[in-house]
Amino acid sequence: MKAAVYERFQGPIALVDVADPLPASGDVVVEILAVGLCRSDYHGWHGTDPDIVCPHVGGHEFVGRVVAVGAGVTRWREGDRVVAPFVCGCGECGPCLLGQHQVCRRQQQPGFTRWGAFAQYTTVPFADTNAVAVPESVSDEAAALVGCRVSTSYRGVIERGRLRAGEVLCVFGCGGVGLAAVAMGRAVGATVVAVDIAPDALALAASVGSDITLDARDHDDIAAAVHAATGGAHVSVDCLGNAATAANSVFSLRALGRHVQIGLFPSALAEFPVSRVIRDELEVLGVHGLSASRFHEVFALMESGRLDPTAMVTQRLALSDVPSALPAMGRFASPGVSVVTSL
């Protein structure tokens, strides 16, 4: 098969012929139908993920058709169209037995702990736990984005953030997961504020559902601007991941609000406005993806017409574009989401 392989971090990515994967016990092999380019893939190539061992194939946000089934798999047959979460749970540990596969103690992550979907084929581990059937009405392009950005934003905004109709949601960072968070807010009937420093990203946020867009460069105090416009957010999400955006997210909340942290910080330790958390009895909530057992809720939103992930897509690529497109993500050259649809 063809795969986009890098031999070292920050090194060249080459489209080369490698052996087709074989299904281990419990796994299925899928032929990739579409795969998203996510900033996490860029960070992996850049060398910031300790789980990656070179040579490596990234790509963790995909939809595929089952072409081979490993021993012990009972739920899947060749020809089934499936997605999988980027965190694949073992199905047997304590968190998995509670249905919280996204914090599995033995988790596998295609594109990180094992080769991923920037290839013509990949494997889904623990397939009876992690593979999810895609409804016929959902396109390959839309389904691929459910594996990471859309499901992660659902977990953050709907499940962890508990956003309700009529509340105010503030989203810091309008990249892929931020745009998905904006769309989630619109889907549940919230007032959505989008914050970024790129006008084209803010324009795209408006097109997918934000009611208010704020360019942080235009405000000395962006949190004060959020309060002036809305009275303060009930839920605020840091989708970028640094001390400034996290602090601004917290300061944008009204009393008893919920801060959701999705973006990863550059370092493990960072300053954080704990005094405000204590004073206003705020909640601080982490997000590490969505359990496969909850994907049906996301698909239900899509089938109802309330959520359309393809509205975020601005580039459709071929697998042969990955060697140049992945390193280019570091330049933040274009807004929206890129999806490989030709393999």
Question: Predicted regions span which residues?
Answer:
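Glycine-rich phosphate-binding loop and adjacent beta-alpha segment
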Residues: A243-R306, S342-L343
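Conserved amphipathic alpha-helix within the SDR
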Residues: D221-G231
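Mid-domain Rossmann-like dinucleotide-binding core that forms the NAD(H)/NADP(H) cofactor-binding site
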Residues: V138-D218, A224
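C-terminal hydrophobic helical "lid"/dimerization subdomain
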Residues: M1, A247-V250, A292-L343
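Short glycine-centered segments of the SAM/dcSAM-binding site in methyltransferase folds
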Residues: R81, V168, V235, G257-H259, ...
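Glycine-rich beta-strand-centered segment in the early N-terminal region that forms part
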Residues: P21-V35, T48-G94, P135-S137
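NAD(P)H dinucleotide-binding glycine-rich loop of Rossmann-like/cofactor-binding domains
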Residues: C90-F172, T310
